[in-house]
């Protein structure tokens, strides 16, 4: 028997990201991405059983990373995971990650002064923060119902959509208990896919939507539907950037990441000059000075 899986374009194993000396900030962003992945899997009822950096692929996602499970040989799909199963998976993740970071230290890819135990603890902290935000009930006073929307907005900031929310009142009706019931990852990704057909990671998609709204404001398109604005934005902003990338540089980064980096480059150029810089000039500068220095991903 043979199992054929789809190739995940522009993805990297963690050792490729550590092929040069990296900063603790990069390590933290990788662990944040892995924590999000683990929470998503546990919400689906998947016990991984072998959580590690080695069994994960990473894709650049604007200034962050997105993580993908690539080895599910030890995984078990259940209707719902117990707290003990989740905690075992999480403890295994911490143990494996600390060991992998020690290997990187021994190879000179991570500074000897870095506390790998503390870095490994980060995935536990981040996981618990996310799990609490996504699943735990919250008590709110009956006259502060606006906090329901605040909870939903916080979940969206984390990249999750709330499909259903339960709300019950305490005896006496002075406080409500709210709890997310159906939570789906990829809130901004789905919006961008629906509006443009672009398959972007979550933070990339969020950056695109922010730029789309800025485009609406600059061109005074308040009366136009979001679909119309998105079409014009694609034609005037996104597509010119992607088309400008020569074939020999197209394997460096995926189009949504290139778009994000062009926006970053535009910001730095504007800061340096103290004024706005035309997009054509920004693209030319980025393709000449920045993208050629990237490795093929």
PLM features: what roles do these ranges have?
Residues 47, 53-103:
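Catalytic activation segment of kinase domains across protein kinase-like and atypical kinase folds
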Residues 20-49, 53-54, 90, 94:
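Conserved kinase catalytic-core helix
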Residues 1-31:
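Conserved structural core of kinase catalytic domains
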Residues 22-24, 76-80, 104-109, 252:
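Short, polar/flexible loop-turn hinges at active-site or ligand-entry regions and domain interfaces
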Residues 101-297:
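Regulatory N- and C-terminal appendages and interdomain linkers associated
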């Amino acid at each position: 028997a043979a199992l054929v899986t789809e190739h995940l374009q522009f993805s990297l194993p963690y050792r490729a990201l550590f092929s040069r000396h990296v900063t603790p900030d990069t390590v933290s962003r990788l662990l944040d991405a892995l924590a999000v992945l683990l929470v998503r899997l546990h919400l689906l009822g998947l016990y991984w059983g072998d959580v590690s950096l080695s069994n994960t692929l990473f894709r650049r996602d604007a200034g962050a990373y997105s993580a993908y499970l690539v080895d599910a040989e030890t995984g078990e799909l259940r209707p719902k995971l117990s707290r003990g199963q989740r905690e075992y998976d999480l403890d295994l993740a911490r143990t494996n990650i600390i060991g992998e970071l020690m290997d990187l230290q021994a190879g000179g890819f991570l500074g000897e002064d870095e506390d790998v135990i503390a870095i490994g603890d980060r995935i536990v902290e981040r996981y618990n923060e996310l799990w609490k935000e996504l699943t735990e009930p919250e008590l709110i006073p009956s006259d502060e119902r606006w906090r329901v929307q605040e909870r939903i907005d916080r979940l969206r900031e984390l990249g999750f959509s709330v499909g259903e929310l339960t709300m019950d009142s305490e005896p006496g009706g002075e406080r409500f208990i709210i709890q997310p019931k159906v939570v789906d990852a990829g809130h901004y990704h789905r919006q961008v896919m629906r509006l443009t057909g672009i398959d972007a990671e979550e933070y990339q998609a969020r950056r695109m939507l922010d730029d789309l709204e800025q485009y609406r404001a600059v061109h005074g398109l308040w009366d136009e539907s979001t679909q119309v604005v998105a079409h014009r934005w694609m034609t005037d902003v996104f597509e010119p950037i992607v088309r400008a990338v020569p074939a020999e540089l197209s394997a460096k980064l995926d189009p949504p990441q290139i778009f994000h980096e062009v926006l970053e480059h535009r910001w730095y150029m504007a800061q340096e000059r103290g004024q706005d810089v035309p997009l054509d000039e920004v693209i030319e500068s980025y393709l000449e000075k920045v993208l050629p220095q990237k490795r093929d991903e």
